[in-house]
């Protein structure tokens, strides 16, 4: 295929990038690619320890999609082998290790969600156990000899743990080396990653050169802040917008993003043309409420379609802006297995209002749970559904369910 002009590719690829090392090499690789009609091999490694993707993950996925759209080879490497080690990047302590079966299962889930952003027909998926599992101990020694302990301790997270007297296991030193080995195996021309992966990506450049390969270009993308506006987006911090979440939740959570992050979200997680960004920035500063509503709608459309965006927008206006209860409430009827009295934590989970009992407990403690608009304060509350239903159970501002009494009355 005919590749677009280099300047055109660079304009798109620079968008949102925190750092390109080195940028002139990327332009040269693109130029050579165009002259020889040979696509670049662009690598993105994914950590399968947490398979639920959120908008923060899409920052780097969207960059890989841009390379795809230009005609380059996109290789998504699932770290099923390195996942058994656990990525120590940004960690203050050793991560728990997973089994190969767990990393494979998570990796498949990651791929299925990632192809909501990537073109599945143009995405090559590889598992690094293909080559790392076959290494002999002598190969591991040879790989480890490529890096010194002093060099490893230049990593901020390792150095901080070392200075604080926190343990660093030897297997953690092998993680960046194994990740770098992935680049050697597929002969990557470009590797993408978050800014927290800078050390690992640059290490791969050195390892490629030691193996008589052309060094990859490293493109670092920023870590997107979550809905709290301070910490990076993370499901564990309860500030994430999942790409598989219900449209209403996705819309509502986007509307809770601080005003000063509207433009950053537009730039990093939407496909609004680059030339329109200055106008978007001006609009976000002058009318943040309207700009955020447009952003929320666009994000929902990207993952769920226009009709879902219409419903999510209407749901938000009715429940949050007007403070009402939506007309089309989902309903839940307890089953005999729930028992005569149902624990509220279980009821919220079974009605798909929370993902876990711990989340439900936290929401009650925050005063975010009501029954027929009456706030609930007791995390251990049990409900006689046959006597008290029907009622509207609300969790947070956007999650509702109408609880119906069991069909067989009090015989639950």
From Swiss-Prot:
GO terms for molecular function: ATP binding; RNA binding; tyrosine-tRNA ligase activity. ATP binds at residue 235. A motif ('KMSKS' region) lies at residues 232-236. Its EC number is 6.1.1.1. The keyword tRNA processing does not apply. A motif ('HIGH' region) lies at residues 48-57. Coiled coil: none annotated. It catalyses: tRNA(Tyr) + L-tyrosine + ATP = L-tyrosyl-tRNA(Tyr) + AMP + diphosphate + H(+). Pfam families: tRNA-synt_1b. Keywords: Aminoacyl-tRNA synthetase, ATP-binding, Cytoplasm, Ligase, Nucleotide-binding, Protein biosynthesis, RNA-binding. Residues 342-405 form the S4 RNA-binding domain. PROSITE patterns: S4. GO terms for biological process: tyrosyl-tRNA aminoacylation. This is Tyrosine--tRNA ligase. The gene is tyrS.
């Amino acid at each position: 295929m005919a590749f677009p002009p280099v300047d055109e590719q660079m304009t798109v690829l620079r968008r949102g990038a925190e750092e390109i090392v080195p940028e002139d090499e990327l332009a040269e690789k693109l130029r050579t690619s165009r002259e020889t009609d040979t696509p670049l091999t662009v690598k993105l490694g994914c950590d399968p320890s947490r398979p639920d993707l959120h908008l923060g993950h899409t920052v780097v996925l969207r960059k890989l999609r841009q390379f795809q759209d230009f005609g380059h080879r996109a290789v998504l490497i699932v770290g099923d082998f390195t996942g058994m080690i656990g990525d120590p990047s940004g960690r203050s302590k050793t991560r728990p290790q997973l089994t190969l079966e767990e990393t494979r299962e998570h990796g498949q889930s990651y791929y299925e969600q990632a192809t909501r952003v990537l073109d599945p027909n143009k995405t090559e998926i590889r598992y690094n156990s293909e080559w790392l599992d076959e290494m002999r101990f002598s190969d591991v020694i040879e790989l480890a000899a490529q890096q010194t302990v002093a060099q490893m301790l230049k990593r901020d997270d390792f150095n901080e743990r070392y200075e604080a007297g926190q343990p660093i296991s030897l297997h953690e030193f092998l993680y960046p080396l194994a990740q770098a080995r992935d680049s050697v195996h597929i002969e990557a021309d470009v590797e993408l990653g978050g800014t927290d992966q800078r050390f690992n990506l640059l290490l791969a450049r050195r390892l490629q050169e030691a193996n008589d390969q052309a060094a990859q270009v490293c493109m670092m993308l920023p870590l997107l802040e979550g809905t709290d506006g301070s910490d990076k987006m993370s499901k564990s911090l309860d500030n994430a917008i999942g790409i598989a979440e219900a449209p209403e939740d996705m819309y509502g959570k986007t509307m809770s993003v601080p005003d000063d992050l509207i433009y950053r979200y537009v730039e990093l997680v939407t496909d609004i043309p680059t030339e329109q960004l200055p106008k978007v920035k001006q609009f976000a500063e002058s009318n943040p409420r309207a700009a955020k509503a447009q952003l929320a709608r666009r994000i929902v459309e990207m993952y769920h379609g226009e009709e879902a965006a219409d419903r999510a927008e209407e749901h938000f206006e009715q429940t949050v802006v007007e403070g009402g209860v939506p007309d089309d409430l989902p309903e839940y009827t307890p089953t005999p297995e729930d028992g005569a009295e149902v624990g509220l934590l279980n009821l919220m989970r079974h009605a798909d209002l929370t993902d876990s009992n711990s989340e439900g407990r936290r929401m009650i403690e925050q005063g975010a749970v009501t029954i027929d608009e009456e706030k609930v304060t007791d995390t251990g509350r049990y409900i006689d559904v046959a006597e008290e239903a029907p009622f509207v159970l609300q969790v947070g501002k956007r999650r509702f369910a109408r609880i119906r009494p069991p069909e067989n009355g009090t015989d639950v």
